[in-house]
Amino acid sequence: MNLSISVFALPKYTNSKNTIFGGWLLSHLDLAGLVECRNTQPGRYLTVGIDKMKFVKPVFVGDLVKIYTGVEKIGRTSITVKLVAKVNRMNGSDEITVTEGLFTYVKTNDENEPEEIKKI
């Protein structure tokens, strides 16, 4: 799997439990999946499905969040990407898996219509 995004979890993204809001992490997973699609084949992609999503452990303020991605499947117009978010806690611990997901993206043209993915 490829490291697609690294970002620090900041206090302004906390929820009522004083952990990082799941929607913040979800948006970064979505962006990391797009990075994987663009690295696989340049073009414009739209997220069409979150096929699987599992929050394993909480993310805390100060954690360094690293999102790893890998292509699971390439279809005629779509790419399915496996995503794994891991963190390094502020105490310098080893990477801990916090979230896993499987997202599907469709390649589109300028009119947002599906476009065939060329086999490389």
Where are these regions (language model features)?
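Hot-dog-fold acyl-thioester-processing enzymes
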Residues: 1-49, 106-120
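Hydrophobic beta-strand-centered segment that forms part of the acyl-chain substrate-binding groove
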Residues: 34-68, 72-74, 78-80, 96-101
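HotDog/MaoC-like acyl-thioester-processing domains
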Residues: 1-5, 60-61, 72-120
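Short, well-ordered turn and helix-capping elements at secondary-structure junctions
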Residues: 11-13, 50-57, 87-89
